[in-house]
Amino acid sequence: VKLHHRVDGPSGAPLLVLGPSLGTTTEVWRPQLAELTSSWRVLRYDLPGHGGSAPATGFTIDDLAAAVLGLVEDERFAIGGISLGGAVATTVALRVPGRVRGLVLCCTSARFGEPGPWRERAELVRAEGVAALAPALEGRWFTPGFDGRWVLEGLREVDAPSYAACCEALAVFDVTGRLGEVAAPALVIAGAEDPATPLDQALTLADGIPGASLTVVPRAAHLAGVERPGAVTTAIARHLRDGGREAGTRTRREVLGDAHVDRAIAATTGFTRDFQDFITRYAWDEIWNRPGLDRRTRSCVALTALVARGHLEELAMHVRAALRNGLTPDEIKEVLLQTAVYCGVPAANAAFAVARRTLDDLGPEGP
C-alpha cells in the first residue's frame, strides 16, 4: 500500500502524523493545521483511493499502519487519527511503542461493531459508488443544521473498490484486548452526538489505555474536528504539550528518584518554572525516552559528560541514577577510568572522590 501525504510546518519541529476518517482526505484536518503547525511538523496522509493515494484493495489496518511507518523517518513522533485513521494510529502505537511520543484518538474505536454492516456497506459501494452514501453520511458526520458540504463533496472522488476495502478492514479490526499495551500518552476525543462511534466506545478506549484522558466535544457528531474545530484543536494542542511533560516527569522520577524530583518541584518558582518545564520535556522526554540507546548507556554518557565539563555538583545525582538504571559500582568505576584517558586525570580524580562518597553514603542497599 502506497499512501499520498503532505507535510506542513517548520522543518526542525517535532513530527505529528495525522490520519483521516473513511471517505475524507488530508483536508479533514485543515481546521487544525494553522495552530498545530506553529509547534509541529504535520504529516497528513490519504487513505487508499482517497485524495492523492492510488487505489488499493485487500489490505488490513495493520497494512495501513505499516504504510504510515514507511512515511516516517523521525525516530520519535506523535500520531493521531479520526475514526479509521484513529485505528491506524492505535496500531502504530502498538507496533512501535518506543517511538510514539503522543497519541490522539478522535471519534474512533477499538472495535467498530459487528462485521456484517461493514461488509454490506462494502457491497453497496461496489454496486452504486461512494456518492450513494452521502445522504446517510451527512447525518453521521454532522449534527442537524451544520453545513459540511465541502467535506461531503469529496465523496464523489473516492475510488469505490478502495472504499469497500477500507470497510472490510474495519470489519475485522479489534484491539480491545490490547489497549493496556499502549504506552504513549493518549487523548481520546469524542463527539457528544456521534452516532458512528458513540461515547461508550470512547470510554472503552479511555478506560483501557493506561493514563488516557477523555475530551467530549458538545454539539458535535463524528467529524468533531470539522464541526467544532476550536474545541478539538485546543484539546489536541494542550495534550501534545502536556503529554511530553508527563512522560518526561515519569522518566525523571524513574531515573533520579521521587525524592529528588519532589524537591525540585517544591523549589520551583515563577522565575525557574519555564526552565523546569523545558528540561522535563526536552531532556527527560525527547532525549532520555528515545529508543536508540538504553538507559544504562545513557547513564554512561551522562557520567562522562559531567566529568568532562567538571559539573561535580550534578555527578553525585547521576551516580545514583546510574545505579537505578542498572549499572554496578564496578561498571561506574570503569566509566570513570575511561574518563581519565579522554577527559584528564585531574577531572577523573575529582569524579572518583564524588562517586566514592556517594556510594559510601548509599551503602549496600543502593539508591
Features from the language model and the residues they span:
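Alpha/beta-hydrolase fold catalytic core
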Residues: V1-V17, T37-R41, T234-G243
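Gly/Ala-rich beta-loop-alpha elbow adjacent to hydrolase catalytic centers
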Residues: G81, G85, A89
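Short beta-strand/loop motif that positions the catalytic acidic residue
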Residues: V182, V188-A190, D194
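Acidic, glycine/proline-rich low-complexity segments that act as flexible tails and inter-domain linkers
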Residues: D242-R296, R324, A348-P367
